[in-house]
């Protein structure tokens, strides 16, 4: 029953249940998708010959294993056969194991070299002149290929001689082949026949194969077996042509599919093509006949080769000759020689004497080769004899055979047998046959004949059928009757019976029938034999058996060993230089070109980096850089050797206050004192007397805390350790100030709905005794409260029996956060402020140990419970040490001698200690360690840590800790170089990280694995596996995602430092590049060294961890030597200045086809064009799906959507453009979850008010021209902002529908600014990467206000935007709004001169990443421009907590502080934020040019400027998942900024244009024309082809595999400029 019948039947039974029908249709679609996915995984083959559509279908049907691309780039004779020859070769080598020694008999060795098959030897004997020409063509093809890699300039190619210059290296996979051919061409190709080939296979190899592509005819069949055995060939895979007509006695056999023909003249068999008379190949028919009919080919007295048929494809027969060991035959097949002779004697009457003797000498394999197996054209046909006689009477009758359909034969014969004896003549039979093969007319309708019979053979068939019918009648008449023939001979009897059949030929025919043995007399009995109608081919093969042998098994151990040793040398080089960017292929080619090994080059790089080679890479004399470099230098107290390249101050040097202030040019505070040698330290408080005690915390005004705010850059002087202690106090102050400032902002916000949740805070309504915002935890230690007068004070909290806070009645509201859960910061700051800041007198020893070296075990073994103290950072580590210590000595570890740092400072207890032991001390601020040393009064301190693991991390973003003060001071350092935890492969990695030799006691050799997952949702598929190990993540965002997904016991890598686990599963579900996941990052070192047995890395994107794991998997099982880490510095090319002129115009040629566009797209984004996404939405709707969502209210009545199929034009260009989707509950919810609910949380602790104002000042200070300084000049007059003229100007720009909606507005009250509507764009954004192949893209969400809200705020922000654009420096900065692409090109026109650095900051989830800090920054900028306070407050209330309603999908939810994609400040607000972000990071006052557009940006900077890590600051301060690109060609607003000599052009991205040409949302032809016009308006610059070469280089900079660029650029202009040609890109469905 068909699928459509099932669907219709199910629809009838379900009374029109659409769901059941959709499920059945879904089943059909799923099966289709699985089939298409399987087909897409096939090997790809490009066939260049020009073939017709029917030929293309034939080739595809004959080779379904390949995904064939027909380019039609070559128009040659016998194109079908020529194109198939390469395809047949690739098919043969799919049967040969990769890397196995192989002989290609008569093979095309250039084809093997291009494919990188260095394990193939080709035998190319010159048996005739055509072979000589073919071999010469092989060598010419190699020269043509090598010329592609040579310089094409005329300087190297001259008439007199050619001086080739290689401009690029060969591909890596071909290098081994060309090396082999260069060293010894005889090993690649020889001029001997295969039987006499002198190239022997390696003695140790037994995986030896051979192939024969149309070359088997020239090897005598009796020599094939011995020749294969001499080379120890295991299997010979062969392909050859043959026609079954030749076996039937025909002199000609046609191969219609390839246009070939066989001609036979005796034993001479010639092959040629119908359309090519010059190509004629001559063979021996007997030799070819033996290859076709034989089954076994004897090699020696033991081995033979059995022919096994594989398939027949497009007139080509494929078979395999498999070596068999006759000694392995079962013993029951043995017979004596006499038995062989006797068994064959019975067949002597049918076969010749020679055949009998040959049968007796062969093995007793009675195998049968069926005729219709080898030749499928003979299936269901019979072999009919055709008789012919000469015109001269008495001449003999000749016979040949043809194939006719069996049904036709029996139908005709049975009908002829019904004729009476007197009426069975040739004319009647001929008339009948003509009638049954002709077309007939039945009821006015022409009906084709059931059988196809050649008209030219019809008369011969009639004659044969008449003769066979006569014989059948004769047999029937004499059956079971004895006939006496004494008086009449057999011939005369037949002559009488056949009288009238052939008239004068009756005598001759009767004699011929008797001679053939069809009619004979045996014992006076007439026997009539009808010839067999189906031919059978048998080849009996017999020999003697004397010994036996066992079948050898396949050995795979060598493959495993080779895998371990692969790339060992290259891995060693990269491990020693993890910070260098190596292109392995280019680096290897460079080393081989110089003739040096990789070890020598590595030593040279190391010597240059360390200075041992006497070469200095870095020279700078810029005075502006000297002070920052000095401040960034390391102290002699912290380094084992002094740094010679720093600016040094003499010991006890006098500080010149004015000089330092002049250098810094910022808010810098200097304290008198002395500077230690080789050190300058930064930071000190303004007023050391301002302190906050814990006892004074209650009812303390907020102003007391805010007065503790410190300048950003503060200089400390004095002893190193004292400066560290002062810096730690300022760090605590900054943390407390940031906390209070944020609580103040939350306290001033308006909260309407009780019981909601917001970020990590809680808001208590003291008047109504309930939580307005429910906190995550209970019983916070303190908070910030506001009284009835609006005064804000800190309060210490108490709670009732129900866990509710108890406050005085004078307070109306309270706010708490995760930072107020404990008194940690307040208590520590209050106590440490009163301590004397003196240099510790204890001896400090740093025990620097590698991961797993037993640092904690050493502490416990040396710890004296009566006199020592152990301090650790976290509570979990503290409990672990107490447990382990008490397991050894019960009661030794107590809460008095094993404590955390916070507990030791806050809960001070009397007593002194002798020795202080600190575990993982390098994760603690050095100032806190110095304080604890003084408090504990110890005489010796042992700090255990690892300088290569994660150090102390500053969590307060508006406070800086100089690198000098972040390093620990110590008197002595002791190393621990042997790990007890890490397996051997991890130890190998550690040797690339540490400068010392690392060894391991572990007996686990290999433990590292990595797995790529297609998306973060796929991590749920590994839930059962992940339950068996510790779960770690790099970021808190990934940790929160796993916890929301239901995973338990998840920690970050930072939290797990110092811990040990048996199995570790490290998970990364964030695709954005992370600073902590990079080469040399301590987070990577910690992540890879936490386990003892097994480590598995699950990641959605390849990164340095995955690369490290893969490299480690390739090394051998022993530890490698250790080397130092080397650094290098890249040099920049200098560009000479030149003059600018108008851009020349060169009209673009209108060339190129649709196939050129498709080829360009496929080379850029391979695989995207094969994505079948027409039914993806219905797959999502009809499948089970698990979603992790925030709080949301759903109307389940909206879950069903009508499946209406829109009528759209079908694009002929296949791109990854999604078809339009129908909005619905699931679709809209999925978009909401993947976009609005998937906002990153990367930022650290920020003081929103302080930092927003600082960023605002920097924004205007850097973007405004020098003549605009006073803030009063920025402010817009209020009268103009709220004027009627301003509103009219805004209203005139709106659509008529908007005006109609506003006409019904009553203008009573302010519309609700926090109420938004939610919808989705029906057409997803086109993907310009490969994610479409494995990910269902979510639709873009639109969150928009009503038109009433826009009418209030639209004119205001429009006026403010105009003011902002008018004050920004127009010569250096461009906000791409209210401008044209021509204006943008004019702005960047002078960027062709100068040595500059081009920076692009690409941010994912830009709108959704914006939080309270971004909103504060934007509002500060609007304040500077003059926005009204009331309007600002209303706008803030509408964005802090947004209520979304999706009426189409039935969704209601609330989101916090995200950029709304549909309000009046969406575009300009995004543009302001990206500009402010870059102004806070980069020295924008020094830029040449900068452009901003939404989330897009481009900056032209001078080279060698100092600026912080942009990606890190974007993550930690701005909460952006950012990627920084430094390229030769800029990219801005979807256009490439191309610098071509003296000119600069902005050309649209060709990939975006070609992708849009595959649009699946075109309704009709009129819509298509509108679409073309809009596309041509965008890409009209393509009419000028000047600069296309630069555009190609810019494209290949991002996508190196892009091919066919110039033709594609011309094709874009060709189709877009002609509406008739553009219509050919689409078809009407």
UniProtKB/Swiss-Prot annotation:
Protein name: Replicase large subunit
Native source organism of the sequence: Sunn-hemp mosaic virus
Start and end residues of each stretch annotated as Methyltransferase: 48-473
InterPro entries linked: (+)RNA_virus_helicase_core_dom (IPR027351), Alphavirus-like_MT_dom (IPR002588), DNA/RNA_pol_sf (IPR043502), P-loop_NTPase (IPR027417), RNA-dep_RNA_pol_alsuvir (IPR001788), RNA-dir_pol_PSvirus (IPR007094)
Reaction(s) the record says it catalyses: RNA(n) + a ribonucleoside 5'-triphosphate = RNA(n+1) + diphosphate; ATP + H2O = ADP + phosphate + H(+)
Disulfide bond among keywords: no
Record's miscellaneous remark: This protein is translated as a fusion protein by episodic readthrough of a termination codon. When readthrough of the terminator codon TGA occurs between the codons for Lys-1130 and Gln-1132, this results in the addition of the RdRp region to the replicase.
Pfam name, any one: Viral_helicase1
Keywords of the record: ATP-binding, Helicase, Host-virus interaction, Hydrolase, Inhibition of host innate immune response by virus, Nucleotide-binding, Nucleotidyltransferase, RNA suppression of termination, RNA-directed RNA polymerase, Suppressor of RNA silencing, Transferase, Viral immunoevasion, Viral RNA replication
The protein's assembly and partners: Heterodimer of a large and a small subunit.
Domain RdRp catalytic: 1396-1509
């Amino acid at each position: 029953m068909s699928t459509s019948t099932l669907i219709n039947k199910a629809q009838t039974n379900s009374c029109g249940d659409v769901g059941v029908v959709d499920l059945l249709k879904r089943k059909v679609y799923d099966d289709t998708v699985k089939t298409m996915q399987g087909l897409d995984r096939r090997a790809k083959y490009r066939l260049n010959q020009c073939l017709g559509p029917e030929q293309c279908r034939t080739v595809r049907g004959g080779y379904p294993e390949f995904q064939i691309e027909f380019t039609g780039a070559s128009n040659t004779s016998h194109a079908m056969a020529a194109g198939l020859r390469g395809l047949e070769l690739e098919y043969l080598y799919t049967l040969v194991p990769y890397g196995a020694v192989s002989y290609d008999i008569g093979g095309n060795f250039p084809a093997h070299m291009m494919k990188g098959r260095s394990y193939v030897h080709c035998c190319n004997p010159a048996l005739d002149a055509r072979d000589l020409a073919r071999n010469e063509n092989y060598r010419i093809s190699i020269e043509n290929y090598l010329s592609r890699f040579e310089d094409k300039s005329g300087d190297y190619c001259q008439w007199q001689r050619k001086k080739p210059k290689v401009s690029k290296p060969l591909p890596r996979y071909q290098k081994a082949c060309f090396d082999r051919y260069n060293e010894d061409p005889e090993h690649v190709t020889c001029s001997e026949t295969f039987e006499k080939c002198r190239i022997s296979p390696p003695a140790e190899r037994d995986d030896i194969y051979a192939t024969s592509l149309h070359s088997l005819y020239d090897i005598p069949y009796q020599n094939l077996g011995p020749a294969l055995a001499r080379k120890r060939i295991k299997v010979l895979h062969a392909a050859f042509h043959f026609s079954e007509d030749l076996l039937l006695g025909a002199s000609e056999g046609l191969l219609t599919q390839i246009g070939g023909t066989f001609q036979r003249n005796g034993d001479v068999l010639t092959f040629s093509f119908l359309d090519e008379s010059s190509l004629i190949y001559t063979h021996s028919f007997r030799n070819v006949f033996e290859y076709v009919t034989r089954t076994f080919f004897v090699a020696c007295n033991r081995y033979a080769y059995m022919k096994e048929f594989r398939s027949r494809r497009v007139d080509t027969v494929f078979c395999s000759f498999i070596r068999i060991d006759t000694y392995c035959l079962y013993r029951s097949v043995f017979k004596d020689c006499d038995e062989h002779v006797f068994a064959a004697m019975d067949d002597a009457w049918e076969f010749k004497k020679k055949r009998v003797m040959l049968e007796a000498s062969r093995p007793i394999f009675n195998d049968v080769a069926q005729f219709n197996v080898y030749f499928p054209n003979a299936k269901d046909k019979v072999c009919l004899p055709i008789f012919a006689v000469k015109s001269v009477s008495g001449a003999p009758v000749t016979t040949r055979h043809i194939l006719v359909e069996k049904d036709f034969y029996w139908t005709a014969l049975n009908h002829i047998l019904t004729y009476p004896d007197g009426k069975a003549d040739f004319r009647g039979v001929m008339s009948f046959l003509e009638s049954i093969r002709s077309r007939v007319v039945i009821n006015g309708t022409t009906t084709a004949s059931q059988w196809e019979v050649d008209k030219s053979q019809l008369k011969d068939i009639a004659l044969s059928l008449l003769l066979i019918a006569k014989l059948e009648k004769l047999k029937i008449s004499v059956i079971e009757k004895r006939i006496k023939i004494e008086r009449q001979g057999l011939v005369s009897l037949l002559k009488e019976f056949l009288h009238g059949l052939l008239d004068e030929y009756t005598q001759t025919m009767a004699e011929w029938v008797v001679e053939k043995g069809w009619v004979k007399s045996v014992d006076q009995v007439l026997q009539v034999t009808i010839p067999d109608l189906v031919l059978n081919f048998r080849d009996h093969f017999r020999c003697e058996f004397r010994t036996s042998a066992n079948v050898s098994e396949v050995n795979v151990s060598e493959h495993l060993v080779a895998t371990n040793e692969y790339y060992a040398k290259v891995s060693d080089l990269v491990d020693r230089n993890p910070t260098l960017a190596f292109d392995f292929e280019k680096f290897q080619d460079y080393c081989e070109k110089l003739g040096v090994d990789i070890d020598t080059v590595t030593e040279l790089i190391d010597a240059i980096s360390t200075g041992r080679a006497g070469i200095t890479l870095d020279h700078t004399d810029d005075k502006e850089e000297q002070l920052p470099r000095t401040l960034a230098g390391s102290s002699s107290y912290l380094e084992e050797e002094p740094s010679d390249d720093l600016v040094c101050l003499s010991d006890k040097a006098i500080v010149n206050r004015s000089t330092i202030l002049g250098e810094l040019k910022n808010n810098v505070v200097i304290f008198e004192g002395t500077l230690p040698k080789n050190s300058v330290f930064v930071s000190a408080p303004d007023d050391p007397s301002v302190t906050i005690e814990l006892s004074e915390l209650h009812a303390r005004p907020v102003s007391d805390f805010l007065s503790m705010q410190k300048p950003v850059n503060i200089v400390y002087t004095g002893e190193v350790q004292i400066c560290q202690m002062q810096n730690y106090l300022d760090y605590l102050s900054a943390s407390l100030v940031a906390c209070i400032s944020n609580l103040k902002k939350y306290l001033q916000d308006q909260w309407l709905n009780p019981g909601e949740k917001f970020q990590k805070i809680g808001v208590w309504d003291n008047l109504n005794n309930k939580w307005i915002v429910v906190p995550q935890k209970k019983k916070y230690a303190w908070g910030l409260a506001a009284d009835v007068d609006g005064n804000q004070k800190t309060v210490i909290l108490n709670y009732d029996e129900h866990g509710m806070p108890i406050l005085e009645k004078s307070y109306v509201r309270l706010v708490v956060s995760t930072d107020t859960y404990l008194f940690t910061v307040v208590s520590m700051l209050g106590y440490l402020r009163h301590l004397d800041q003196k240099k510790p007198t204890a001896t400090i020893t740093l025990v620097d140990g590698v991961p797993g070296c037993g640092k904690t075990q050493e502490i416990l073994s040396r710890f004296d419970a009566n006199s020592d103290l152990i301090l650790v950072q976290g509570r979990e580590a503290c409990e672990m040490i107490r447990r382990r210590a008490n397991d050894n000595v019960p009661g030794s570890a107590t809460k008095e001698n094993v404590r955390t740092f916070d507990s030791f400072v806050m809960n001070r207890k009397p007593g002194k200690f002798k020795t202080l032991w600190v575990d993982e001390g390098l994760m603690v601020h050095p100032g806190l360690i110095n304080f604890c040393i003084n408090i504990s009064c110890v005489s010796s301190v042992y700090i255990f840590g690892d300088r290569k693991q994660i150090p102390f991390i500053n969590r307060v973003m508006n406070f800086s800790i100089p690198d000098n003060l972040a390093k620990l001071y110590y008197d002595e350092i002791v190393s621990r170089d042997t790990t007890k935890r890490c397996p051997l492969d991890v130890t190998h990695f550690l040797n690339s990280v540490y400068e010392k030799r690392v060894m391991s006691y572990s007996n686990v050799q290999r433990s590292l694995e990595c797995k790529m997952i297609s998306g973060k949702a796929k991590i749920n598929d590994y839930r059962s596996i992940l339950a068996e190990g510790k779960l770690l993540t790099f970021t808190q965002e990934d940790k929160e995602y796993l916890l929301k997904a239901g995973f338990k016991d998840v920690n970050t890598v930072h939290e797990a430092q110092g811990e040990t686990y048996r199995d570790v599963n490290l998970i990364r579900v964030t695709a954005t590049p992370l600073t902590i996941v990079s080469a040399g990052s301590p987070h990577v070192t910690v992540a890879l060294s936490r386990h003892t047995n097994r480590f598995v890395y699950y990641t959605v994107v390849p990164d340095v961890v995955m690369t490290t794991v893969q490299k480690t998997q390739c090394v051998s099982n022993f530890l490698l030597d250790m080397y130092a880490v080397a650094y290098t510095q890249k040099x920049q090319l200098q560009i000479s200045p030149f003059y600018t002129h108008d851009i020349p115009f060169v009209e673009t040629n209108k060339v190129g086809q649709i196939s050129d566009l498709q080829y360009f797209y496929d080379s850029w984004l391979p695989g995207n064009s094969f994505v079948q996404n027409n039914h993806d939405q219905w797959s999502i709707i009809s499948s089970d799906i698990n979603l992790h969502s925030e709080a949301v209210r759903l109307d389940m009545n909206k879950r069903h959507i009508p499946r209406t199929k829109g009528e759209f034009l079908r694009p002929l260009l296949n791109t990854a453009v999604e078809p339009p989707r129908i909005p619905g509950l699931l679709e809209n919810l999925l978009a909401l979850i993947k976009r609005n609910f998937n906002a990153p949380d990367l930022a650290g602790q920020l003081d929103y008010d302080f930092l927003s104002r600082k960023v605002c000042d920097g924004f205007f200070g850097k973007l405004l021209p020098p003549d605009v300084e006073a803030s009063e000049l920025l402010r817009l007059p209020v009268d103009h902002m709220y004027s009627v003229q301003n509103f009219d100007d805004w209203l005139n720009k709106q659509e008529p529908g908007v005006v109609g909606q506003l006409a019904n507005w009553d203008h009573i009250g302010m519309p609700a600014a926090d109420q938004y509507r939610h919808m989705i764009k029906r057409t997803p954004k086109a993907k310009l990467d490969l994610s479409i192949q494995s990910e269902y893209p979510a639709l873009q969400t639109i969150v928009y206000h009503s038109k009433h809200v826009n009418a209030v705020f639209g004119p205001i922000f429009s006026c403010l935007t105009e003011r902002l654009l008018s004050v920004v420096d127009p010569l250096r900065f461009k906000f791409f709004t209210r401008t044209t692409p021509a204006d943008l090109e004019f702005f960047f026109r002078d960027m062709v001169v100068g040595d500059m650095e081009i920076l692009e900051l690409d941010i994912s989830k830009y709108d959704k990443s914006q939080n309270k800090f971004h909103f504060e920054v934007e509002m500060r900028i609007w304040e500077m421009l003059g926005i009204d306070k009331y309007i600002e407050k209303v706008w803030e209330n509408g964005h802090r907590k947004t209520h979304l309603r999706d009426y189409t999908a039935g969704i209601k939810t609330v989101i916090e502080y995200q950029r709304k994609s549909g309000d009046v400040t969406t575009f300009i607000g995004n543009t302001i934020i990206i500009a402010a972000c870059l102004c806070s990071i980069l020295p924008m006052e020094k830029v040449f040019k900068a452009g901003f557009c939404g989330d897009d940006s481009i900056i032209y900077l001078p080279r060698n400027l100092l600026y912080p890590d942009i990606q890190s600051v974007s993550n930690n301060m701005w909460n952006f998942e950012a990627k920084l690109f430094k390229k030769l060609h800029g990219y801005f607003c979807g256009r490439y900024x191309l610098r071509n000599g003296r000119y600069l052009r902005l050309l649209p991205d060709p990939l975006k244009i070609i992708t849009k040409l595959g649009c699946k949302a075109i309704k009709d032809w009129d819509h298509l024309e509108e679409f073309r016009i809009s596309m041509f308006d965008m890409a009209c610059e393509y009419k000028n082809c000047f600069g296309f070469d630069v555009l190609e280089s810019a494209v290949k900079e991002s996508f190196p595999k892009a091919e066919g660029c110039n033709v594609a650029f011309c094709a874009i202009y060709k189709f877009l400029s002609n509406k008739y040609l553009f219509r050919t890109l689409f078809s009407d469905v």
